[in-house]
Amino acid sequence: MFTSTAIKNKKIPRIYIEDDLDLNQFYFLSDENRHYVTKVLRMKIEDILEIFNNTHYIFFAKIIDISKKIIKIQTFKKILKNLESPLHIHLGQVISKNEKMDFTIQKSIEIGVKTITPLFFENDHFQKKRINFSNKIKRWEKIAISACRQCNRNIIPKIKIPMNVFHWCENNQNNDKKIIFHPKSTLTMKCLTEPIKYIQIIIGSERGFFNDEFQKIIKYGFIPIRLGPRILRTETASVVAITALQTMFGDFK
């Protein structure tokens, strides 16, 4: 049996399991996890895994059997580990090109965003082509799990079904603070003086916002704020905005 000291002194690979877990129980890994453990990590019988399952707990498990088709593990330790920020950031990200959108999802999760809704305008190219979002959502969810595995988050942020920007604004008429980041705004982050626990933010895609779009979003109660004097790429803007908010109101203090 591995001691707590042995666990602390060794970097233990993390995997995500959807199942409800309990101590001293046996589980079989999914095909995806089996491939990752055997082909990527090259793990063997008796090696230890750290498991997260979308709760505030992590489990340690020992590999007890490996074959071509199965990996059997047994849990032996459970630890409460809450790394979630007290600031709930809901990112409304206007969908950008594939690799940029992937980057935005990955990095925003690593720095603490809790909910992501991909957004689009009616005249966007993929909307005209009536692209089925199901495959994109599956890809984004995998990116979210991978980001959590890397950064030690145990609660996987929600990636919601893509929505029209204005429908999203209309459906989120609550008491949350709302911000749209725009390089031509005269307001800066310094205008946010009161404590914030829940906030919704909109980040544009590569094309930015047309003036009529910008004005309509403001009418839904979104405060226009700029992120410094420079114009940022869409994937940079999301990281900068979330980092600034985490520094002011979250767990980057």
From Swiss-Prot:
User: What reaction gets catalysed by this protein?
Assistant: uridine(1498) in 16S rRNA + S-adenosyl-L-methionine = N(3)-methyluridine(1498) in 16S rRNA + S-adenosyl-L-homocysteine + H(+)
What keywords sit in the KW lines?
A: Cytoplasm, Methyltransferase, rRNA processing, S-adenosyl-L-methionine, Transferase
Q: Where in the cell is it found?
A: Cytoplasm
- Supply the SUPFAM superfamilies for this chain: alpha/beta knot (SSF75217), PUA domain-like (SSF88697)
One biological-process term from Gene Ontology? rRNA base methylation
Question: Which Gene3D superfamilies does the record match to this protein?
Answer: 3.40.1280.10, Hypothetical PUA domain-like, domain 1 (2.40.240.20)
Task: Give the EC number(s) under which this enzyme is classified.
Answer: 2.1.1.193
Q: Which GO terms describe its cellular component?
A: cytoplasm
Q: Which GO terms describe its molecular function?
A: rRNA (uridine-N3-)-methyltransferase activity
Question: What does it do?
Answer: Specifically methylates the N3 position of the uracil ring of uridine 1498 (m3U1498) in 16S rRNA. Acts on the fully assembled 30S ribosomal subunit.
Do you know which PANTHER family this protein is assigned to?
A: 16S RRNA (URACIL(1498)-N(3))-METHYLTRANSFERASE, RIBOSOMAL RNA SMALL SUBUNIT METHYLTRANSFERASE E
Note the subunit structure. Answer: Homodimer.
The family note in this entry says:
Belongs to the RNA methyltransferase RsmE family.
What protein name applies here? Ribosomal RNA small subunit methyltransferase E
